[in-house]
Amino acid sequence: MNSWQKIRMAKQQQVRVARQHRAAKLGRLYKAKKLRAELCEKLQLQRVNNDAALAKAFEEEFVYPHFSFYLYTLN
C-alpha cells in the first residue's frame, strides 16, 4: 500500500468519525427539543421563555422521582 493510499484511508476514516459525531449531536438536540416541547405541552403553555419555570417543571417531572429512588436504594 502506498503512502498516498494510507493518507486517503486515514482521511476517509476521519470523515466517517466526523459524520458519526454530527449524527449523535443532532440526535441529542432532537431529543432535547422534543423533551422541551413535551414539557411545554404538559404545562399547557404555548411558549416557555422563563427558564426557571421550565427547570422546576423538569426537576419535578424527571429528577426528583428518580432521585428519591436512588436515595432509597442507597440506604
UniProtKB/Swiss-Prot annotation:
Per UniProt, which keywords does this protein have? Early protein
Origin, by domain of life? Viruses
What protein name does the entry list? Answer: 8.9 kDa basic protein
The species this protein was found in: Orgyia pseudotsugata multicapsid polyhedrosis virus (OpMNPV)
Q: What is the lineage of its organism?
A: Viruses, Viruses incertae sedis, Naldaviricetes, Lefavirales, Baculoviridae
Q: Which gene encodes it?
A: P8.9
